[in-house]
Structure formats: structure tokens, C-alpha cells
Amino acid sequence: MPQNKKAVVVGALGVIGRYIVEKLLAEGDWQVVGLSRRPEKEGPRYRHISVDLLDLEDVARKLSGLADVTHVFYAAFQPGTGAAANYATVIAPNRDMLVNSVTAVARASRRLERVVLVTGTKYYGTHLGPLKTPMRETDPRHMPPDFY
């Protein structure tokens, strides 16, 4: 089976990112590049790049060789500390990590077809306080400020 699909999974060692990596590799026709701050063991179709997504120069240098990437799955999130009221302090760094990584891949690869932004329950405002239950996917999202 030809391996012409190549994915970059940003946040590859996180809760969601590691399952995206696992799923893509299980499908058999993907090559996967995982990005995270921590190093990770590589495999036959898996390469890992340890990178600081907030350091634009580090990102540009380390991702410049990704000329054949077709997909980016963005699952990284840098949490803040303290109460939900401090959530506004994590918006800028998370936005910057997203912009830095996707921009670097888009510049390196002329084959980029799709970027997938993986979101969670913060889309609905769970970080702002109690919500109605049960929640439904059709519930309205909370309005910005948010990095999503």
C-alpha cells in the first residue's frame, strides 16, 4: 500500500494527540510526525520532533524539512494555573503555538491539504463554570475571547 499521506500531529504526547498518532499508524497508509516538548521513541512510520512551539525560530528551523506533509492535526494545549478566571492568560500562548506550527508546516510543504483543529469542551465554555447537563453537540458555543 503506498504511503503518500503524511501527518503532523501537534501535541502528539497529549491525551488526544497520542490517540490520533495511534489511529493513523494503525490505518497503515500514513507516515506520522509527532510534535511535543518532550522527546519520544520513534518507529518505522513515526518520527518525533521535540520542539518549543512558543519559540518561532525553533519551530521554523525544526519544521523546515517537512516538505511532503499532507495533513496537520493540531491537538496541543498549554493549560494555565489557578481558577477559570485566569483562562484569558492562556489564550495568547495557545494561539501563538497554533499559528507558529501551522505556518511553519504550510511554508515547508506544498502538499498540505488539510488542517484539523481538535477542540474539547472549552468550545462550550466548560472552563467558565457550571453548564446544563446533559450537554449536546447542538448547544451553542461560548463566545470569545478564546483561542479556538
Please annotate each region the language model reported.
Residues K6, T70-H71, R114:
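Structural motif
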Residues G11, S36, T119:
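Short beta-strand/turn micro-motifs composed of small residues
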Residues G14, F77-T81, T121:
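Flexible cofactor-recognition loop at the NAD(P)H-binding site
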Residues E40-K41, R47-D96, N100:
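NAD(P)H-binding glycine-rich loop region in Rossmannoid oxidoreductase-like domains
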Residues P2-E27:
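N-terminal Rossmann NAD(P)H-binding glycine-rich loop of SDR-like oxidoreductase domains
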